Amino acid sequence: AASDVYKRQTYAGQLKLRPYQTLHFELGRAVVGQCGSLISKVLYVKQGTRKKFAILDAGMTDLIRPALYQAFHKMENITSEEPLEAYDVVGPICESSDVFGKAIDLNKVKRGDLIALRSAGAYGEIMASGYNCRELPKGYTSDELV
C-alpha cells in the first residue's frame, strides 16, 4: 500500500548511506529458527523406575542450546501415530547435560522412530561440535514447505 512505500522511503532517507555503502541485515532467530529441524533416530527406549527415556542418535554436540541454556525445542515423533506418552528425551553423549527435554509428550516411541526437534534452524548447525569424537550433523535443504 501507499503507506508501506512511504515508510520504506522515510526509513531509507534516515539511513543517509553514502554511495559506497550498502546495508546488510541478519534475519535473526525469529525467522531463521523456525526454518530448520533436527531429525534424529531413536537408538533405545529405556524404562526407568519412574519414567521413560527416549535415547536419540543426536546429542548436545548436534544441538547444544538445551544443554547450554535450557532452550526448549518442540519435539514430535514423525513416524508414530500411537497414543501420547511422556519421555525424557536425551542424547547418547556421556554427559548429564545431554538432555533435550524432560516429560515430553510424544506419540509412543520405539527404536528406529524419527524424532523431529523443531525450531533448530538458528544456531543449530553453527554451534555443533565434534566433541567426544562425534561427526558433525549432515544438513539438507529444501524449498518445499511441509
Over which residues does each language-model region extend?
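Acidic/histidine-enriched active-site and ligand-binding environments that engage anionic O-linkages
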Residues: 18
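Charged (often Lys/Glu-rich) extended helix/loop segments that serve as interaction or gating elements
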Residues: 21-146
